[in-house]
Amino acid sequence: NPPSGEVITANNKIIPDDYPYLITNDWAEPYRITRITDLLENVQKHSLLTFAQIQLDQTSLMAQEFLPYLLELTPETSLERSALAELLSWDGTMDRNKAAPLIFSAWYRELAKLIYSDELGETFEDYYGFRPLFVSSVLANETKTKWCDDTRTPAEESCEFVESKAFKEAIVYLSNTYGSDISKWQWGTAHYAHSDHAILTDTPLGRFFDIKIPNGGDAFTVNAARFGIGNDEPFTQTNGPGYRALYDLSNLDNSLFIHTTGQSGNPLSGHYQDFAETWRDGRYIPMTMKREDIEKGKMGTLTLNP
């Protein structure tokens, strides 16, 4: 019961450096916990609505941190100029309907590869990931580090060179994958929440029952939507908040919840995926607590016999 009245966790480090016992060395970066804290402290009196807004927040502090490096680049083609124009007015919100999150994520994917693939060699694929604290340290301390230099070439590459090369390669990748019309680029086209069927996923029928829905967010937004930049589909969402709930402890009947996909695991049921868009769009359903209300709203009874 801390004096602040706040209990917050986002897989972040929750212990001081001198804590005597090992819990883990694999803490999440501080972006999400920082954003949650800011959103909590910016409102004097919260409600279910303001807590819902926190749960659904898609502002990436990680993107905001790295965006200035992108905006310093000089574009050389019309497509590069159009891409940078998208980023100039972008605030780091990972909106599924916008091109900027896709451009940024593609650039960062190439940037990480260029910074440390040469040093790691054959082991690179095992460690290919965001690692934003490391990458940020490299870019901020160029005079003290050689990570930006490509050890496979005789020249000594600067971080500015690597940032620019990553941007060019990202634009080529995006144009080859999504076409050269930036107005048709959308984050959700590449970044979709993918839910496999629990049983059928490894069968020939599995792909017919997968649930795929365009989604916003990234690994560093409060509304987490992690993806693996080293994967074959580098922007496909691999995990996120499978269940959201808002509990009103003064009146539990006001509580709300939602989870991904649907209540049924039967692909032929109308409730197999009827929650998917509700979940994605940040809507909730009532958490019915009273037995009489549950009976009124039930759609059937499933009886399990031994």
Pin down the residues of each PLM region.
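Active-site acid/base region of carbohydrate-active enzymes
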Residues: 82
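C-terminal/peripheral segments of proteins
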Residues: 1-72, 76-79, 89-306
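Cationic-aromatic interfacial patches
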Residues: 85
